[in-house]
Amino acid sequence: MLNTMFPTINRESSMLGFGCMRFPTTPDCKIDESEAIRMIRHAIDNGVRYIDTAYPYHGGESEVVVGKALKDGYREKVILTTKLPVWLVKTHEDMMKFLDEQLKKLDTPYVDFYILHAMNNERMDAMQKLDYKRFYAEAIAQGKVRYPGFSFHDDAKAFLRILHDWDQWGMCQVQMNILDDENQATLEGIREAGRRGVGVVVMEPLRGGLLANPPVDVKAVYDAYAVQRSPVEWGFRYLYAMPEVITILSGMSTWAQVTDNLRIFDMAKRPTLTDEELALYQKVKATYLARTKTRCTGCKYCQPCPMGVQIPRIFQGYDAAMLRADSSFKAGYAQIQADHADASQCIHCRKCERACPQHLPITRFLEEIHAASTAE
């Protein structure tokens, strides 16, 4: 296993981290507890030193199962991270209330990282008003939390705002993969975190599995390259070549995924990507993106629409279906129609187009996607 170090806090981790939001489930959709525990412990026995969970994962049951998995001496072997559900926090006191509830679920007196979950500009406003820094000082003084951090879903400007708001962040958790190097935190945001000594933990390294099972045209790009690796290996290699990345989370849901990831990371060394490899990644990205229509980043500057059209939901859902080369969006669009948020509500005011930082022809895209999604 490739071992790593969080720079400012001088804490050892592993390049592979176990994300606990996609555990195996039983036919009645409950966590297969015995299998999940077996998977976590096998990963730890083979060098994984970072475990990531959160308050809402698996309907609130992920933390309970993680707590059970970390019995019998396993807790002391890992960095344990869970997250404050900031969207549920209404008062300063709520922060400690949620932390105490989560510690009870995890059956541990402390967590290593307690991070603000899914932060964006709006949530940062709320956390500042509720004095999140004072909460962390209290939780750390009481021995319940070792280090603060945040996970993130917004644009690059918002990321830098949150990153620069405090010099005590121990880590940041961001979405990054071959397709998202210019989305959300962006590569430059990751580099700025590195310059500030804030360790980067990557989520969605394979875009929810999308990059693990590429369509035929993307697979052909990989197959034409001189060195043969699986798409999963290529996806992880892109990330662990980044010196700022300390841990890459994988939401493993099967024993096979655990063993395959352990195999990949057992062989991993931080490479310096060659010009040929960088060109390969650019070609893979371009081939994926050529399948999409809108390339909407989900920034939501177009929202709210005066007619209630959920533009990012439509655009990102459609593009995702095109990336997967399937027809699943039709069912999703039917639900958007049922919500009265589909493109037929558009009155062509073009308020959205004036607000779009990508200068997308939103009205035209809405018409074309509506036609494609409602055709017999």
Pin down the residues of each PLM region:
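Glycine/proline-rich, positively charged
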Residues: 27, 87-206, 213-220, 226-227, ...
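Structural motif corresponding to the early beta-alpha repeats
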Residues: 57, 73-92, 117
